[in-house]
Amino acid sequence: MVLSSTNVATRIRLGALILLSIRLGYSAELKPETLTAWDDYIAQETAQVKQRATLDKGFLWTDAQPNRYNDIRNGGTVVEPMGEYNPLRVEGGLIHHWISAVFIPNAHIDDVLAITRDYAHYKDFYKPGVADASTISKSDAKDEFTIRFVNPSVLSKSSLQGNYVSNFYRLGTNRFYSTSVTTSMCEIKNFGCPNEKRLSQDQGSGYIWRLYSTARMEERDGGVLLEMEAIALSRGIPAALRWFVDPVVRRVSRESIEKSLNDTATAVHARLDACEAQNPHQIIGAGNCSQHAGNSDLRAKRLAGDAGR
């Protein structure tokens, strides 16, 4: 959800973003004009992401206002909607765009990437929203992976299976950004039941049709400042229900991206603690904890233990 791998944190929670409390009883159709509006929006966003990467000042959204960094540096998580209208109504759908930032003390960029690229343990890091995740292919600059996340609504036994491509860019020694986009998104009806059925892409409820995210990181002040920017395309909301559904969507959007970022920070700290316990005389830093075998399983067990307390 930062949207790429790091973004996946946000991507995952965006599965809970649309109509969590309401089950609309009919399917939604993804229209060509809806997809065109989405493609245009993402093209503009991609251009802005690339422009930010060239800036010495202005790379991070956080630095645009001094109070943001002060709040984040003091342990807060800042979450804000992007754009004048959020969600943005387009023909046949809605575009949801949010950004969030958090400071992870005593960490390096590689420590964060060790979590956000560890897809096999997403179900531990980001539960209960993630049912499963796995790597399709992996390289220094690009990952392909799949995530199945569940709709936590008690009114609907549904799941979404998404395939993603993330691209990674290092900017010197202390900056990094990544982008992530869905290559396919399929709804799974009757999730976990004997009659479970995977629908074709763009069929079903239309809770989530497309996802795009960006993650930006900078090492400073003894830690990592992590930003996640997440964008989702969903079905439109019938006019008769907007008065009730719109506030729910905005509230859940804010809570979801905030939880994603906090889950990532928690997983990073658990990883560092586990590495230190395993290697008490080693100076941990710059991601070198990941060089020790077994740390993924160890930190997954640590997270499971923390959740059970």
Role assignments for model-derived ranges:
Residues M1, I22-L30:
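Charged, low-complexity surface segments at secondary-structure and domain boundaries
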Residues M1-T10:
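N-terminal secretory signal peptides that target proteins for export/translocation
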Residues S5-T6, I22, Q291, D297:
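Compositionally biased regions
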Residues S5-T6, L17, Y41:
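Generic hydrophobic-segment detector
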Residues V8, L24-G25, G308:
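Intrinsic disorder/low-complexity segments in short proteins, especially the signal peptide
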Residues R11-R23:
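Bacterial N-terminal signal peptides
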Residues A28-R309:
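Eukaryotic helix-grip
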